[in-house]
């Protein structure tokens, strides 16, 4: 059985007690129906599904759809963020932790993250290399980057971290429907 994790991030600075960086993954299992296909019906803008673009009723419908699938999700939260920036440092710490948990607890050896600027993607790759050299990750663990419009499975973690971020900000957008599916 092949399991691949697909990851995306969210940053919350307003409406939360402390600024937070969220890095979440959807663990795709090739033996189960693909949740990303079911979420495709909610795409409003050509090419990609963004949590921040949804109307409140769509956010509830998306969470209802996610809750109907027996999929695994994992979110790492780094908080607090320093006032002037800090997102990249938080991301690298969260990525290190996330990769270790994926391999150790979920037997996942491949992670696909949404592509950002090349220099930022290089930092992700360096973080994974450090974990491999430290023997915290095996040499088999692979990290790749793809554009969200090129792989709809990247849409799933965007929805999950978006819902968690809304919940942390006191907004009722369906998090309670999916909370039991997220570790």
Predicted regions and their residues:
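Phosphate-ester processing/binding pockets and catalytic centers
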Residues: 1-183
């Amino acid at each position: 059985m092949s399991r691949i994790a697909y990851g995306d991030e969210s940053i919350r600075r307003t409406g939360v007690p402390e600024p937070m960086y969220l890095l979440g993954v959807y663990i795709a299992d090739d033996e189960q129906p693909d949740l990303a296909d079911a979420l495709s019906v909610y795409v409003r803008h050509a090419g990609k599904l963004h949590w921040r673009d949804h109307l409140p009723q769509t956010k509830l419908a998306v969470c209802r759809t996610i809750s109907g699938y027996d999929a695994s999700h994992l979110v790492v939260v780094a908080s607090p963020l320093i006032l002037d920036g800090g997102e990249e440092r938080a991301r690298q710490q969260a990525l290190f932790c996330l990769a270790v948990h994926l391999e150790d607890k979920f037997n996942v050896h491949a992670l696909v993250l949404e592509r950002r600027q090349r220099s930022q993607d290089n930092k992700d790759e360096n973080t994974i290399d450090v974990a491999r050299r430290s023997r915290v990750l095996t040499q088999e663990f692979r990290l790749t980057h793809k554009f969200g419009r090129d792989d709809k499975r990247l849409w799933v973690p965007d929805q999950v971290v978006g819902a968690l971020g809304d919940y942390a900000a006191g907004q009722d957008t369906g998090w309670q429907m999916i909370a039991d599916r997220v570790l």
